[in-house]
From Swiss-Prot:
InterPro entries: LDAF1. It comes from the Eukaryota. One of its GO terms (biological process) is lipid droplet formation. Plays an important role in the formation of lipid droplets (LD) which are storage organelles at the center of lipid and energy homeostasis. This is Lipid droplet assembly factor 1-B. The gene is ldaf1-b.
Length: 162
């Protein structure tokens, strides 16, 4: 069991080293450095929820914006064929549709970002609790009770009864 944990720990350390090397490569790029030193980059660095919301919004809006630009290019060809009135109507309707889609995506990206943040906080709390519990149980098995006033949790009671 200890060797599996050691192997897992070594793999995680190797992965952390690779991730740090990758992040250094990105951060050493001159354009990234210029962006991070700009007021907008500093604002995003100080507000991670806004950054996550913006990332989700941009990721989700690429396809509708691409479809809109394809539609605009297709209607531009139709202009060459003298269909000016139809083009104006189609671009107006598609522009309104794009506006509606992007507004919906903006609201959805805020919700997704909020869910991701809550999941991260809840997950890290659970993992921290599990780790603290495993450390406490392991310490108690090796050296006796941790304290005289220790009250057993429901999980400890179920473990001791089985």
């Amino acid at each position: 069991m200890a060797s599996a944990e050691k192997l897992y720990r070594e793999k995680m350390q190797e992965l952390q080293k690779q991730l740090n090397k990758f992040m250094q490569t990105i951060n050493n790029h001159s354009k990234v450095d210029a962006f991070l030193n700009s007021p907008f980059g500093q604002y995003l660095d100080e507000h991670p929820f806004v950054t996550l919301s913006l990332l989700v919004f941009v990721s989700l809006s690429v396809v509708p914006a691409g479809l809109f630009l394809t539609l605009v290019a297709g209607t531009a060809i139709a202009v060459c064929l003298a269909v000016l009135i139809i083009e104006g109507i189609v671009i107006s309707v598609s522009g309104i549709a794009l506006l509606c889609i992007l507004c919906g995506l903006a609201v959805m990206s805020l919700g997704v970002a909020a869910i991701l943040c809550v999941s991260y906080v809840a997950g890290s709390s659970v993992f921290n609790y599990m780790h603290a519990y495993r450390v406490a149980v392991g310490t108690r098995e090796r050296s006796g009770p941790i304290s005289l006033n220790h009250k057993m949790t429901m999980a400890e009671k179920s473990l001791s009864s089985s």
